Amino acid sequence: VLEALLDAELKRHSLPASALGLVGFSQGTMMALAVGLRRNPSPAAIVGYSGALPAAEVLPKDPGKAPAILLVHGDMDEVIPLDAMLIAREQLAAAGLPVEWHIAQGVGHGIDGEGLRLGGAFLKQAFAAAASVR
C-alpha cells in the first residue's frame, strides 16, 4: 500500500524515483528502511530518526543500487535504545550499503535541532547527487 502511494505521488507530480527521499521517526524509520531498501528504482535517500532495521530480509541483493542512508539516534533514548541504531548501522554497512550516522548527545526518543539540520543537509546532498546522474 505504501509503495503504491509513493508511486502515485511521484507520477502525480511528474517526478522520477531519484527525486524520492524517505524520512521516518521511530517505527517510521523501520518502514522507510523496509520500503526504501526494496524499491526499484531506489529512492535518493533514507533518513531515519530513533529507529532500527526491521529485519535483515529487507537488505537489498544489489547494494550498488541502494539509496544513501543517514541514521540519527539519541544516546538517552528510552524507547528504542541506541544499540538498535548501532546494530542497524553495522548490518547496513556489512551489506555494502552507504550508511552515515549521528549520535545526538543528551537526546531521548526525539529529534533535536542538530538532527534536523543533519537530515536536511543529507537530503539536499542526496538529491543533488541523484539529479547529476539523471
Predicted features along the sequence, with ranges:
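Short, hinge-like loop/turn segments at secondary-structure boundaries
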Residues: 62-66, 118-121
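Primarily recognizes the serine-hydrolase "nucleophile elbow" in alpha/beta-hydrolase
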Residues: 10, 18-65
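C-terminal catalytic histidine-bearing segment of alpha/beta-hydrolase fold enzymes
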Residues: 83-134
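A short beta-to-alpha transition loop/helix N-cap that caps and shapes the active-site region
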Residues: 53-58, 79, 111-112
